[in-house]
């Protein structure tokens, strides 16, 4: 706990497509961890083939996006 009361957890989402960041090595995952940290999260790992971030800033959108489902234009 960093004492940041505004943090949330969630799947990282690609804003353009509404898709999750895909990952294949479940659990501890370097790619997810670095992508999550890139947007200010505490850490990230691969859960159900998507990058899950813990301790995300409130301002970072997470999956699912209200107006975009992955795969539809």
Curated annotation (Swiss-Prot):
Show the propeptide residue ranges. Answer: 71-73
- Which GO terms label this protein's molecular function in UniProt? sodium channel inhibitor activity; toxin activity
**Cytoplasm as a keyword?**
no
User: Which Pfam families does this entry report, sorted A to Z?
Assistant: Toxin_3
By its UniProt entry, which SUPFAM superfamilies does this protein fall under? Scorpion toxin-like
Q: Which CDD domains match?
A: neurotoxins_LC_scorpion
| Tissue specificity remark | Expressed by the venom gland.
Tell me the compartments it is located in: Secreted
- Residue span, LCN-type CS-alpha/beta domain: 8-71
Query: Which branch of life, at top level?
Result: Eukaryota
The record ties this protein, via PROSITE patterns, to:
LCN_CSAB
Annotated S-S bridges: 19-70, 23-46, 32-51, 36-53
Query: Which stretch is the leader sequence?
Result: 1-7
Set out the biological process GO terms recorded for this chain's protein: defense response
The PTM Cysteine amide maps to 70
Tell me, in a sentence or two, what this protein's role is.
Beta toxins bind voltage-independently at site-4 of sodium channels (Nav) and shift the voltage of activation toward more negative potentials thereby affecting sodium channel activation and promoting spontaneous and repetitive firing.
- Annotated family: Belongs to the long (4 C-C) scorpion toxin superfamily. Sodium channel inhibitor family. Beta subfamily.
Q: What protein am I looking at?
A: Neurotoxin Cex13
Organism ancestry: Eukaryota, Metazoa, Ecdysozoa, Arthropoda, Chelicerata
